[in-house]
Amino acid sequence: MAALRALGGLRGVAAQVLRPGAGVRLPIQPSRGVRQWQPDVEWAQQFGGAVMYPSKETAHWKPPPWNDVEPPKDTIVKNMTLNFGPQHPAAHGVLRLVMELSGEMVRKCDPHIGLLHRGTEKLIEYKTYLQALPYFDRLDYVSMMCNEQAYSLAVEKLLNIRPPPRAQWIRVLFGEITRLLNHIMAVTTHALDLGAMTPFFWLFEEREKMFEFYERVSGARMHAAYIRPGGVHQDLPLGLMDDIYQFSKNFSLRLDELEELLTNNRIWRNRTIDIGVVTAEEALNYGFSGVMLRGSGIQWDLRKTQPYDVYDQVEFDVPVGSRGDCYDRYLCRVEEMRQSLRIIAQCLNKMPPGEIKVDDAKVSPPKRAEMKTSMESLIHHFKLYTEGYQVPPGATYTAIEAPKGEFGVYLVSDGSSRPYRCKIKAPGFAHLASLDKMSKGHMLADVVAIIGTQDIVFGEVDR
């Protein structure tokens, strides 16, 4: 009955509200028989406090299943596995990375090497000491003559000979031209990977000029086989030193243009600063050398600490980084190019006259002019190039400061005309081993910047 009375009261209110001309205001006096009830404070307080009071019924309460049939399961989120390379344009050859990504963040980076393995160290054991030389051009095929220099120094140490001064100055001159070749490739391809195309085209024009110097002195643009045990293959042609001087004078302007484009570029700095940071302690533990070691703040350059050829007679500075990131290593490479120009200028000024091969008929072939008149010279030349020369038994580890780092040759002789063992220590191998450590926690795009700053060539890594 009470419900019916309440319903009747509501009908009366609705009739008054809907009457034409009436406002939306409720009547002040309710209809007869209707009581208006407002919830009092005591009644509202019983619903305050916690949502669920623990009681016998609610103590063992569990939320109902989501779909009333199956209970919810813990979903396992898996990281994505990505194959980077070996045909990736930013992989610099045949690098294959098996990467584990969480979103776009790198959790693991596993380099797979060996795709350019050619068995160089074993092949050298079946060749004479001179025939083994061209294999070294094909190791780090961006800095060719530096590899030849390391091997030649190792053989000379076993033979206990020293090339004449002019040959040593020519070696240093072309060693620094080779350093320019390598650093141009390293910096411009690094920039190209990060989106800056212009430096690549500007500086590769300069690189072609240096290939021309290679060609004029040896006949080959890349695999020169010019620096040989006992000296160099032939003397510098007329006019070459003048052209190298003109080139080195103009090249510093190209470097200024490169730095205008990159050094203070906001995008370049964002992509390289604090990317791939390696502390000095980590760099030593991983066995870094070259720019990778100096970028972390350790001043170690074999041209200064253990000079070979005539590096103790030239003046140059060793640039050192402070943070150990990609930006510091870029700055080190640019400054090394400027120091190489200093060394080239000193080589041109101090180049002495004289012989370019050691005066030892057991090692050096006779002159071409002699071979045209003397049968003995022709036989001597033939025997040297077919049988080779015997090297006294012994072992040596000889290292040079190649553009990428410490390039070492461990050479063992058993007294024959062929090496018993030739172990090649490539700098890029140790650098690639740290790729997992350097890229962990970075974005996928930063891995490209880290590969570029490591300056890896797979001829020397895979051997």
UniProtKB/Swiss-Prot annotation:
Keyword Isomerase: no
Organelle transit peptide: 1-33
The record's account of how the chain is modified after translation: Dimethylation at Arg-118 by NDUFAF7 takes place after NDUFS2 assembles into the complex I, leading to stabilize the early intermediate complex.
Positions of disulphide bridges: none
Residue numbers bearing the N6-acetyllysine modification: K62
Alphabetized PROSITE patterns for the sequence: COMPLEX1_49K
Keyword terms, alphabetized: 4Fe-4S, Acetylation, Electron transport, Iron, Iron-sulfur, Membrane, Metal-binding, Methylation, Mitochondrion, Mitochondrion inner membrane, NAD, Oxidoreductase, Respiratory chain, Transit peptide, Translocase, Transport, Ubiquinone
Topology versus the membrane: Peripheral membrane protein
Gene Ontology annotations for the cellular component aspect, listed alphabetically: mitochondrial inner membrane; mitochondrion; respiratory chain complex I
Catalyzed reactions: a ubiquinone + NADH + 5 H(+)(in) = a ubiquinol + NAD(+) + 4 H(+)(out)
Cofactor: [4Fe-4S] cluster
Cofactor binding annotation: Binds 1 [4Fe-4S] cluster.
One Gene Ontology molecular-function label: NADH dehydrogenase (ubiquinone) activity
Keyword Magnesium among record annotations: no
Gene Ontology BP, a term: mitochondrial respiratory chain complex I assembly
E.C. code: 7.1.1.2
Similarity comment text for this entry: Belongs to the complex I 49 kDa subunit family.
Role noted for this protein: Core subunit of the mitochondrial membrane respiratory chain NADH dehydrogenase (Complex I) which catalyzes electron transfer from NADH through the respiratory chain, using ubiquinone as an electron acceptor. Essential for the catalytic activity and assembly of complex I. Redox-sensitive, critical component of the oxygen-sensing pathway in the pulmonary vasculature which plays a key role in acute pulmonary oxygen-sensing and hypoxic pulmonary vasoconstriction. Plays an important role in carotid body sensing of hypoxia.
Name of protein: NADH dehydrogenase [ubiquinone] iron-sulfur protein 2, mitochondrial
Gene: NDUFS2
